[in-house]
């Protein structure tokens, strides 16, 4: 089992953020999932920025799963054993991650259908106690509640540890596909800071104690 990450807090007058050290343990496995059906994508840019913020604060190995890449092999499968090997490998990465960063554009008032189809194949108990950072993009602020009304209930079914602070971005936060909003950048940084202690806690707990 991994040891709990202990923050080393800098003195107040330095203005430096806490640094997380993990000793001799392996890097945390961070898997980001973009539910966008387009490339390039604001959603992919957002989950990438969140992953980068985590990487600035902890030792990680990251992987990005894009539905634009695996969608054709995913869409036609009705059972998990019908999935092509490359999609099965992505599912195993999701199930074995220490932290999931999941994001979807708002599509017909919810996440994309292929995003849901992907998680329909995830084992019912394979995300128990797993930290999940929720993110979404939409055309305006009126769609921001997708995180609370759509994404959070989905991962509550899996008994995942959804982080209280989600990250929503609208079109005005981007110039093309580049994040330009200082407010959004600050929220990404705050989400990363708050995620790390929970990732360390979850990684130190035997999953057998969490399944019930």
Predicted regions: what is each one?
Residues 162-212:
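Glycine-rich phosphate/pyrophosphate-binding loop and the adjoining helix
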Residues 124-128:
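Short, conserved loop/helix-junction motifs that constitute active-site signature segments
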Residues 6-7, 13-120, 186-189, 197, ...:
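N-terminal beta1-alpha1-beta2 submodule of the flavodoxin-like/Rossmannoid cofactor-binding fold
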Residues 132-170, 183-186:
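Short, glycine-/small-residue-rich phosphate/pyrophosphate-handling segment
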Residues 43-44, 112-116, 144-148, 178-181:
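Conserved strand-to-helix beginnings and helix N-cap segments that scaffold or border functional pockets
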Residues 63-73, 157-175:
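Mobile beta-alpha loop/short-helix "lid" or hinge segments that flank ligand
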């Amino acid at each position: 089992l991994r040891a709990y990450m202990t923050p080393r807090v800098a003195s107040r007058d330095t203005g430096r953020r806490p640094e997380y050290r993990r000793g001799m343990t392996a890097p945390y496995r961070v898997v980001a999932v973009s539910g966008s059906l387009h490339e390039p994508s604001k959603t992919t840019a957002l989950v990438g920025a969140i992953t980068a913020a985590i990487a600035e604060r902890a030792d990680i190995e990251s992987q990005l799963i894009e539905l634009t890449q695996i969608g054709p092999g995913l869409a036609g499968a009705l059972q998990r054993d019908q999935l092509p090997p490359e999609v099965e490998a992505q599912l195993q990465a999701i199930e074995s991650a220490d932290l999931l960063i999941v994001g979807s554009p708002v599509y017909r008032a919810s996440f994309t259908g292929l995003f849901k189809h992907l998680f329909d194949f995830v084992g019912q108990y394979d995300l128990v106690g797993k930290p999940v950072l929720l993110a979404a993009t939409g055309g305006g602020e009126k769609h921001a509640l997708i995180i609370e009304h759509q994404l959070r209930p989905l991962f509550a079914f899996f008994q995942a540890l959804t982080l209280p602070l989600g990250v929503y971005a609208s079109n005005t936060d981007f110039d093309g596909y580049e994040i330009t909003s200082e407010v959004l950048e600050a929220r990404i940084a705050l989400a990363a800071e708050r995620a790390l202690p929970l990732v360390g806690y979850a990684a130190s707990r035997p999953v057998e104690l969490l399944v019930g």
